[in-house]
Regions:
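Domain-edge interaction signal
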Residues: 1-155
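Small, basic N-terminal interaction modules of short regulatory proteins
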Residues: 140-191
Length: 191
């Protein structure tokens, strides 16, 4: 079991996939991962409780998780200038982390960070984050209703956890070629 809180684990994992992310992007990655987790797993990955802040979804608990990473030597925080603004660059250190995520959570975290890695913070917010169901119609200061993501579940009934279990089964050699299974069914039908 990890000695990091769940929220710190989420941020650290995202930094492994997207080193150099700033505060805004890091928080938005966590938010989007929680949105996808609600969609496919029916629950969040993190323990963040998002509110509509001045710059979109945010939870002040981010600072505790970030401080936990930096103070514990799991990430670096470097102050930088971005045009006229002060910003921060976060990077994972070489200190190993034992994550408490299941495979579906890992895939969601990786997917979000890789998918939005090249987005600027502005385009990430305007083109993606602000268009998510919890943000639609929300007012500044309100807690976001993350369960609205459940309304956007895959219409085909895609079950991420079952798919990953099947993939692991195939990787472990526990499968039968389709031709073999069909031939067996035909033989049973003829008998």
């Amino acid at each position: 079991m990890s000695n990091l809180s769940r929220n710190a684990q989420v941020l650290r994992y995202l930094l492994e996939v997207a080193p150099g992310a700033g505060r805004i992007k890091l928080v938005k990655y966590a938010y989007l991962a929680d949105c996808e987790a609600y969609r496919y797993l029916g629950r969040a990955i993190s323990g963040f409780r998002y509110r509509f802040d001045n710059h979109g979804p945010f939870d002040r608990a981010f600072f505790d998780a970030k401080d936990e990473l930096v103070d514990g030597g799991y990430a670096t925080e470097t102050a930088i200038r971005i045009g006229p603004y002060d910003g921060y660059d976060y990077r994972p250190t070489n200190q190993s982390v034992e994550y408490g995520f299941n495979q579906a959570e890992v895939e969601i975290l990786r997917y979000v960070a890789q998918t939005y890695l090249n987005e600027t913070a502005i385009s990430l917010c305007e083109d993606v984050v602000y268009k998510t169901p919890p943000m639609k119609g929300a007012k500044v200061g309100e807690r976001l209703k993350m369960d609205r993501m459940k309304e956007e579940q895959d219409p085909l009934g895609f079950d991420l956890e079952r798919l990953l279990e099947a993939e692991a089964s195939v990787d472990a050699g526990r499968y039968r070629p389709v031709k073999e299974a069909v031939d067996e069914l035909r033989a049973r039908h003829r008998a």
